[in-house]
C-alpha cells in the first residue's frame, strides 16, 4: 500500500518478496483496491497505470546502491529468515534510512527514546541480533497503519484496503533524511485520481511518540482477537466489554506517557 502511494506520486519502488511472488509482480504488476471518500465501492489501482516504476526482487537480488529509503513492512519474526537477515546487514552497512510500518517497533527505534536507550529489550524480539548493526537515528516508525489484507481467493499481488487511515511517521535524526520524508509527504498529498483526493497519506511528526499511539490500539483490539477457543473480530474484542477495553487502552497510554509521550501525541479512545 505504501509502495502504491509512492508510485502514484511518481517515485520508483522495489518490493522485496519471495522469488515466486517477485516473478508474479514483475510479470503482472500489483493491484490495490481502495475506497475514495463518498464512493460506495472500491477502486482498483494497477501499478502499470501509475507514473512511478515498480519492480520486485528476492532478498539476494536486491542492489542496495539503487535506493534512497528502505521500508520495513513485515512482521518482526520474519526478519529472522536468513536471506532477509543478510539483506538487513547490507542495509545497515549502507546506512540507508529505514521507515518502518511494523506493528513491533524495530529495536533501534526504541533506542531513540531516552527512557529505553539502555533498557534490556532483547527478549522482546525473536532475534534481536538482526537489529544490532543499525544506527538508531536511521530508523523511524509509522502509526497507526491503514488496515489492508490480501484476499485469500486472489493472487499474492492483490491488496484490499479495509481502513484507509494515514501513515504517521516520526522524523529521522538527520535533516537530510527528514527532507526526503517531507518531500514524500508532499508528493503523496498532491496525488489525485479523476480529480479526487486519494486517502492514506504520509504525515510527518517531530515527536518520537506519535507512532506509539499504535500500542494502545493493538493491545486493546488486534492482540485480543485470539482467544483460547476461537478468533474474534476487533469490533467484538473492543466492544465486548467497553469498560475493560478503555482500561487497557488508558493503561498503555499511561505507559507511553511515563516514557515521555505527551497527551497530544496520543489518539483518544473514544475516536
Task: List the predicted regions and their residue ranges.
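NAD(P)+-binding Rossmann beta1-loop-alpha1 motif at the extreme N-terminus of oxidoreductases
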Residues: 1-34, 107
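Conserved active-site and cofactor/substrate-binding residues in soluble primary-metabolism enzymes
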Residues: 20, 82, 175, 179, ...
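N-terminal glycine-rich dinucleotide-binding loop that anchors FAD/FMN and/or NAD(P) in oxidoreductases
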Residues: 30-55, 122-125
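Rossmann-like NAD(P)-binding element
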Residues: 43-100
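Rossmann-fold dinucleotide-binding core
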Residues: 65, 94, 99-216, 220-221
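Short, flexible active-site loops
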Residues: 166, 226-240
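Flavin-binding catalytic cores
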Residues: 180-195, 244-265
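C-terminal substrate-binding/catalytic lobe of Rossmann-fold NAD(P)-dependent oxidoreductases
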Residues: 208-228, 249, 253-271
Amino acid at each position: 500500500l505504501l509502495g502504491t502511494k509512492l508510485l502514484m506520486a511518481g517515485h520508483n519502488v522495489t518490493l522485496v518478496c519471495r522469488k515466486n511472488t517477485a516473478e508474479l509482480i514483475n510479470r503482472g504488476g500489483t493491484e490495490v483496491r481502495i475506497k475514495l471518500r463518498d464512493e460506495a465501492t472500491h477502486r482498483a489501482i494497477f501499478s502499470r497505470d501509475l507514473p512511478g516504476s515498480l519492480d520486485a526482487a528476492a532478498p539476494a537480488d536486491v542492489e542496495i546502491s539503487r535506493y534512497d529509503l528502505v521500508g520495513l513492512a513485515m512482521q518482526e519474526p520474519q526478519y529472522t529468515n536468513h536471506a532477509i537477515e543478510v539483506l538487513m546487514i547490507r542495509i545497515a552497512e549502507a546506512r540507508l534510512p529505514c521507515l518502518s510500518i511494523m506493528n513491533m517497533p524495530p529495536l533501534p527505534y526504541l533506542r531513540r527514546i531516552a527512557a529505553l536507550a539502555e533498557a534490556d529489550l532483547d527478549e522482546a524480539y525473536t532475534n534481536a541480533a538482526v537489529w544490532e548493526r543499525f544506527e538508531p537515528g536511521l530508523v523511524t516508525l509509522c502509526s497507526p497503519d491503514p488496515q489492508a489484507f490480501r484476499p485469500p481467493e486472489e493472487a499474492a499481488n492483490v491488496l484490499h484496503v479495509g481502513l484507509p487511515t494515514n501513515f504517521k511517521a516520526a522524523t529521522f535524526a538527520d535533516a537530510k533524511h527528514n527532507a526526503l520524508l517531507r518531500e514524500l509527504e508532499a508528493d503523496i498529498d498532491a496525488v489525485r485520481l479523476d480529480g479526487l483526493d486519494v486517502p492514506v497519506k504520509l504525515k510527518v511528526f517531530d515527536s518520537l511518540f506519535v507512532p506509539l499511539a499504535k500500542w494502545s490500539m493493538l493491545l486493546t483490539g488486534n492482540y485480543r482477537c485470539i482467544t483460547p477457543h476461537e478468533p474474534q473480530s476487533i469490533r467484538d474484542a473492543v466492544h465486548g466489554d467497553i469498560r475493560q477495553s478503555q482500561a487497557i487502552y488508558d493503561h498503555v497510554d499511561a505507559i507511553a506517557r511515563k516514557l515521555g509521550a505527551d497527551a497530544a501525541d496520543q489518539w483518544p479512545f473514544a475516536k
